[in-house]
A protein has these predicted regions:
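Small-residue (G/A/S/T)-rich helix-start motifs and N-terminal tracts that mark the onset
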Residues: 3-103, 112-129, 134, 138-180
Length: 180
């Protein structure tokens, strides 16, 4: 059966750290292989050069500055997976999140950026999925023992209207109402 490339969704993956380009490449390939119709990787030149060899099915765009037009037609955004922590990434993520209305998945360095800008959590207008490990989650809430983590995760997800996928030996997923 033949279908147009965009029939099964249009994903924007925001990344850009040369040192963690493997994370960007694996995430792009996973999105393509999971059935996303069009995967666009918004990154730096070195990541994009590697992408053309590792995952030629994905499209790409160089990330010099935020351009709202690049979000047109996108149905979901993945931020992280090789983003890198620097002033440009922080400015870029804040600008992007203030303009998007589509679901966003957060993984990696962007969680650190999000923890520094709680106002973004309080004012989002779409479905957000945060995927921190225990150390990243501690940047948002303070818990002393693992037993406190379940209650903290539920309260956090409910307060900010997000789905939390707390990764670890015993992964916890909560939307604030139900926990798995």
């Amino acid at each position: 059966v033949y279908k147009r490339q965009g029939t099964y969704g249009r994903i924007m993956h925001v990344t850009g750290c040369y040192h963690y380009r493997g994370a960007a490449l694996l995430a792009a390939k996973a999105a393509v292989y999971a059935g996303s119709g069009l995967v666009t990787v918004w990154s730096n030149e070195k990541v994009i050069d590697s992408l053309s060899l590792f995952c030629p099915e994905a499209t790409s765009c160089q990330r010099h500055y935020f351009d709202e037009h690049l979000l047109q037609g996108k149905e979901a955004i993945l931020i992280g997976s090789g983003l890198g922590l620097n002033e440009d990434s922080e400015r870029f993520v804040c600008e992007l999140l203030s303009h998007t209305q589509v679901p966003v998945v957060f993984d990696g360095d962007d969680l650190t950026i999000l923890a520094k800008h709680p106002e973004l959590l309080e004012n989002h207008h779409s479905s957000w999925i945060l995927t921190p490990h225990h150390g990243e989650f501690k940047r948002f809430v303070d818990f002393k023992q693992t037993s406190e983590m379940v209650d903290q995760a539920n309260a956090f997800a409910k307060k900010y209207h997000v789905t939390l996928d707390l990764k670890g030996p015993h992964t916890l997923i909560s939307d604030g109402n139900e926990t798995y």
